[in-house]
């Protein structure tokens, strides 16, 4: 994607070793992604048990891969499709409301929480209850410049004030943001260097 000046939903990967893109969609992952929000798509290919107890293949990915389940999965695996087979229906491939929700610092509910019914659709938020074969997700324009800021304080109220100010008043939201408590920071200074190198 770099050659197109684009980025995927997450460029930081996951806090879980071995996590996958599909797994991220299944769990609506992306808690640190302030600007893009949790992984979400309405375009996916998956198998599930229907209300009659029968295993079925659901092709919501909007790519013409054939008619039968075997044909669809074979063409997907062997990449037997072209741009002409790809359709662009009026469906979401990201959470297009998240920025508005995360800026609402006075809301009664958090911007992101588990099992948010607003973002449960097909593979999105399925939490492993179906077998997902493929997903389509939006990409994002790569920023020309980025800057990382580390902010430390002994007063949690100071962080709350900074967070509210950024979300309410900044023209552009941060790409991502993460909290580390003191014990975590102190431990990282001494431990886990080998894990970092391996990953």
Where are the regions that the model predicts?
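Short active-site loop/helix that positions an aromatic residue
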Residues: 1
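Flexible, glycine/charged-enriched surface loops at secondary-structure junctions
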Residues: 7-11, 163-192
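FAD-binding subdomain of flavoenzyme oxidoreductases
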Residues: 4-7, 11-158
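A conserved active-site cap/scaffold subdomain adjacent to cofactor or substrate pockets
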Residues: 144-176, 197-199
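Short, intrinsically disordered, charge-balanced linker/junction segments flanking boundaries
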Residues: 16, 193-199
